[in-house]
């Protein structure tokens, strides 16, 4: 009987030591799941003199906010739209490819608006007399560390 009890204790200790331990992390996880906030707007039929001719652009901007943004930190999208229009109207290098123009837009928006964690700009350029093709550039840029 003692041998059977001893064997039972050995088996119990073996099972206890070899069993995996599971920790619940529900206390630290958000109750409603993770939150991702995004916003988007478009600039339609924006006229610009670039690359030696008049061009018609259609621009779609979408962006993701930083986590835990407060009400006072939300930028009014009209500010972003106006900043894009101003950058394009006063663009310094008329020879830049559209991809470079697009990279400057995303860089400017992330620099100026710290509440934005990432931004995507899709720029469509309609056919023109010199370039009879529809073209587009899509650039996504993220804040470092966000």
Which residues fall in each region the model found?
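Bacterial N-terminal signal peptides that target proteins for export
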Residues: 1-10
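Bacterial N-terminal signal peptides
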Residues: 9-19
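N-terminal, polar/charged subdomain of small-to-medium soluble alpha/beta proteins
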Residues: 23-146
């Amino acid at each position: 009987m003692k041998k059977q009890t001893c064997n039972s204790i050995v088996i119990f200790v073996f099972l206890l030591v070899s069993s995996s331990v599971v920790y619940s992390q529900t206390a630290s996880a958000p109750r409603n799941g993770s939150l991702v906030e995004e916003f988007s707007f478009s600039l339609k039929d924006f006229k610009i003199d670039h690359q030696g001719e008049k061009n018609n652009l259609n621009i779609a901007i979408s962006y993701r906010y930083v986590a835990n943004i407060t009400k006072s930190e939300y930028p009014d999208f009209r500010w972003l739209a106006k900043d894009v229009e101003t950058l394009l109207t006063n663009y310094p290098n008329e020879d830049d490819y559209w991809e470079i123009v697009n990279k400057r837009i995303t860089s400017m928006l992330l620099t100026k608006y710290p509440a934005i964690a990432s931004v995507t700009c899709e720029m469509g350029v309609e056919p023109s007399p010199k370039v009879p093709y529809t073209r587009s550039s899509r650039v996504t840029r993220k804040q470092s560390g966000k």
